[in-house]
Amino acid sequence: MLHCARRYMLVRPRLLWQSGTCVARFQSSVRTPASEPSAEKGVDEWLEAINELREEFSAKEYLPETSLAPPGQSKVDLLQGSQAGSKIKPTAEQLAQWEALKSVPIPPRKNATLDHITNMIMRHGKKEKAQTILSRALYLVYCQTRQDPIQALEKSLDELAPLMMTKTFNTGVAKASVIPVPLNKRQRNRIAWNWIVQSANQRVSSDFAVRLGEELTAIAKGTSSAFEKRDQIHKTAIAHRAYIQLK
C-alpha cells in the first residue's frame, strides 16, 4: 500500500490550459532516453498548429484555394486540378471490354414476373422476407442447373401454366354448361405458382426456400408432379370444346 502511494506521488498529472485546450502532463522521475522524441514537444507543435488554424479562420474568410495550397505556393487552382484528374485515358483491356459489352442490352430495373411471384409469396406485408425466400430458391436452381435462374423460372411457369380453365355457367335449365375459358398471362402464372407451392409443401425440408428451389428444379427438368394437373385441365377443356362460344 505504501509502495502504491509513493508511486502515485511520483507520477502526478499537471493540467495546463493553453489556448482553451487542456493538456495533461506528467511529472515523473523516470528519465526518457535522449534519442526518443519528447512527448511535450509533440504536444506543443500540435497546439501551435491549432492556434494557426484559429487565427486563419478568425482573421479572414475561409478560402479553399489558399488553405489547400502546398508549401511555398500562395494559391492553387482547384478547378484545373479536378479537370486534370478527369482526363483519364482507358487502357487497351478496358477498350476491349467496352467493345464486347457494347452490344449487350441493359437489363430492366424490375422484372414483372419476379414482382408478381414476390407478391404471392409475401405474407403480412413482409416483402423483404419474400424477396429473400425467392432469391435463395433461385440460387439453389442455379447451383443445380447452372442456368440463368430467372429465365429458368419464366420458362417453368410458361410450360406448367394451363392455357385455359373450365367454368360452369347456369343455363336456366336443369343442366349447367361447362365452358372452357382462356386465361391471360397473369392468371396462368398465378395458377402455376399455386401448383408449385402445393408440390413444394409435400417435400421433406423444413425450409420453405429449399423446398421451393427443389420444386423449381424438378419443373425445369420436367419431373414434377404438377404437370399432371395441367394435363387434366387441358383434357377437361378439350372434352367440353363444343360449348365454346365464338364471337
From Swiss-Prot:
Span of the transit peptide along the chain: 1-26
Pfam families: Ribosomal_S7
Keyword list, A-Z: Mitochondrion, Ribonucleoprotein, Ribosomal protein, Transit peptide
Matching CDD domains: uS7_Mitochondria_Fungi
GO MF annotation: an example: mRNA binding
A biological process term (GO) from this entry: mitochondrial translation
SUPFAM superfamilies in UniProt: Ribosomal protein S7 (SSF47973)
Subcellular location, record wording: Mitochondrion
Family of this protein: Belongs to the universal ribosomal protein uS7 family.
Known function: Component of the mitochondrial ribosome (mitoribosome), a dedicated translation machinery responsible for the synthesis of mitochondrial genome-encoded proteins, including at least some of the essential transmembrane subunits of the mitochondrial respiratory chain. The mitoribosomes are attached to the mitochondrial inner membrane and translation products are cotranslationally integrated into the membrane.
Quaternary structure and interacting proteins, as annotated: Component of the mitochondrial small ribosomal subunit (mt-SSU). Mature yeast 74S mitochondrial ribosomes consist of a small (37S) and a large (54S) subunit. The 37S small subunit contains a 15S ribosomal RNA (15S mt-rRNA) and 34 different proteins. The 54S large subunit contains a 21S rRNA (21S mt-rRNA) and 46 different proteins.
Note: Present with 1340 molecules/cell in log phase SD medium.
Record protein name field: Small ribosomal subunit protein uS7m
Lineage: Eukaryota, Fungi, Dikarya, Ascomycota, Saccharomycotina
